[in-house]
Amino acid sequence: MSTPQLIFSGGSGRSGTTVLAKLLRTHPQVRASRPLEIRCLTDSAGLLDVCLGPGADAPLGVRALARSRPLLFAEFRRRLRGRWWERTNRLGKVSGLHRGITPEQRETLLRELQRSVGQDAREAGRSFLLELARMQGLDAERYWVDTSPPNIAHADRIHRLVPQALFVHMVRDGRDTMASVMNESWGPSDPEAAATWWSDRMVAAHRALTEVPADAVLTLSLESLVVTERAEEYRRLLEFLDLPDRPRMRRYFAEQMPAERVRPGSWRERVADPDQVERAYRAAAQRLEALGVPTHEFGPPPP
């Protein structure tokens, strides 16, 4: 069996990663992860932490566990059997890895990781991901795609684990992202906090991607893909993945991703005080520009 190509899509969150996964999985050569966000790779005490050590932003508790790999692995195992296995997502639906593999397959993955991580941690982590993809039914498909939003902020570490991985960075106008996240029960409720939430993630993504080869990264604007440059961006996505166009995928793009679905600039209708959101966004955007981080703002800036 040939080795599947792993694709990791991500972004700030609320930026179109799920939209991308649903489009790609209509192609006969692509299988989407089940669930669309596996979580066990980039979450705290996840596979990256077990195989590479905790990242710079890891919680203190995970740093303490990492002093002993057996303790960190035990926490990984507990979470793989718990919150990553079955959880209620933001839509109130049950999600988790149980949708893609059996408990017996999960335990096989854990046993093999525990056996091999002390010998070659990177190879152990890579093998875990590849075997997970195969267990989820990967057969004739060339690609397996996961769309956990933190993937891009951890792209440098994922690249160390899987050097052949490809990354699709989904971006969206910060004000629409802010409005979207402010309407989530788990999100920041005021514009300043939402602007910080967005800009922090843009900085993390930018820094991580500087450590990844440029030809392994595609940055896609949700607005350009769905609204303003549909044909060009659709073609660019296919070319990046070296995929031939297929009728089912093109039909899905035309019928399920019409331009009116995205409505750039609709943030003004979804917030209580658009002027306050604009001010908070503008201050955050200026900070990003000072750091050399692209904002991917949709449309011309105000005069």
Segments predicted by a language model, with ranges:
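A conserved segment at the C-terminal end of the G1
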Residues: 18-30
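Catalytic donor-sugar/metal-binding loop of nucleotide-sugar-dependent glycosyltransferases
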Residues: 28-32, 166-167
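PAPS-dependent sulfotransferases, especially Golgi type II membrane carbohydrate sulfotransferases
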Residues: 1-8, 182-185, 206-210, 215-217, ...
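PAPS-dependent sulfation machinery
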Residues: 35-144
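P-loop (Walker A) phosphate-binding loop of NTP-binding proteins
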Residues: 11-12
